[in-house]
Amino acid sequence: NDHVTSFFFDHYSAFVLGIDDQYVAADEGGGPRQVAPGRGHLGLSQHIAMAMVADEFDMSFFQGKAVDHGFLSPLSMLGDETGPWPGRVVPLQVGVLQFPIPSAKRMWNLGRTLRKAIESYPEDLNVAVMATGGLSHQVHGERAGFLNEAWDAEFLDLLEKAPQELVNMRIAEYAAKGGMEGAEVVMWLIMRGALSDNVRLVHKQTYAPSVTNIATLVFEDLGGEPDQAAVEAYRRHIGHE
């Protein structure tokens, strides 16, 4: 979620993939954050883009746009903000601020395609899939300041053990349980959809300081190696398109 920093409601896409070699910090009102830029991976970005379109996701693509805390904050858990950040990044901006919002099922299916894209990329890479989006919160209207820590705990548990229950929920249900802005947790289903059914919970922590409940969740994918025949077939599928 870009928080209307570089992507505005006059042209607001459901899914926007970055295809660039660098992503700098945006000015979110107090000047750009003094953090290192994220280094892009052009080859993997292009491959993911081809896979998404081949699987009939109507994507937008961007270059030269600054990224905000929704993208940069998780990187601070991986290294020193003065940089350079470890590894390279492929940002995906999801339009969760203006209706119609893509469904939870759509997020999940995009994650499944993301997995196939990563598995079929010719270079042997170690890839971590990161999702962001605040847990329960609402910043406007009669429920401004709303938190629901019980729902947040249930959401995190379902994400680990029974994600299909979350896939079947409507956006309105997410908003009712977690606040309008808290509905952005559907973006976590992209990450979970990119993993196998068999995951190990490595770390889980929540903290509700004021306006937003914040969680850190780390899974290890215990799924086996991909079937090479299926990988080759998927490469042909992408190439055919």
Name each region found by the language model.
Residues 1-2, 92, 125-135:
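Beta-strand elements within well-structured catalytic alpha/beta cores of enzymes
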Residues 6-109, 120, 142-241:
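Flexible, D/E/H-enriched segments
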Residues 138-139:
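Short, solvent-exposed loop/turn segments at secondary-structure junctions
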